[in-house]
């Protein structure tokens, strides 16, 4: 069984999905599963994902019956994930090749969430401010975040314990179609 499930919601991202998948399959830590969630786009994203799935059996593709939008697409991926830890990757992003390995190095049985830094890519790698420079308990983490200026809360850039994430999803009313932005902050 994989230790980390990488959830890749997919909706009209044919321009980016190959790079995202390459960054997953080439992780230095190999004990992963990659779940591509087809959210009913109308481009070639899923055809591209299927080509990768033929070559790598760690890739699973699930198909939503209708466009569920990002939050619910992520939830569908989490529900089928086999690993105890979940990492969300937006299809237009990619992981450094040692991202999972670095997370695993600091995992222990009490780890509920690991946050890591990101880069904005223009013509050069321009790092976003280092938000996470220490280890925090949940009780100390949220007060720390509240004090940060300009903190962008995203589901990506974090490794979540699956059971805690499922609990958070169950607290939400995912049938509320009015959730169309900032859904990352709800998790």
Question: Residues of each region from the PLM?
Answer:
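Conserved nucleotide-sugar donor-binding catalytic segment
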Residues: 142-187
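Acidic helix N-cap motif at the loop->helix transition within catalytic regions
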Residues: 18, 43-52, 94, 98
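Conserved donor NDP-sugar-binding/catalytic core segment of glycosyltransferases
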Residues: 98-129
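Short, well-formed alpha-helical segments that are part of the catalytic scaffolds
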Residues: 12-26
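Short beta-strand/loop segment that forms part of the nucleotide-sugar
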Residues: 31-40, 60-64, 90-91
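Glycine-rich, basic loop-to-helix element that forms the pyrophosphate-binding segment
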Residues: 64-81
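Short aromatic/hydrophobic "clamp" motif used to bind/position activated sugar donors
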Residues: 86
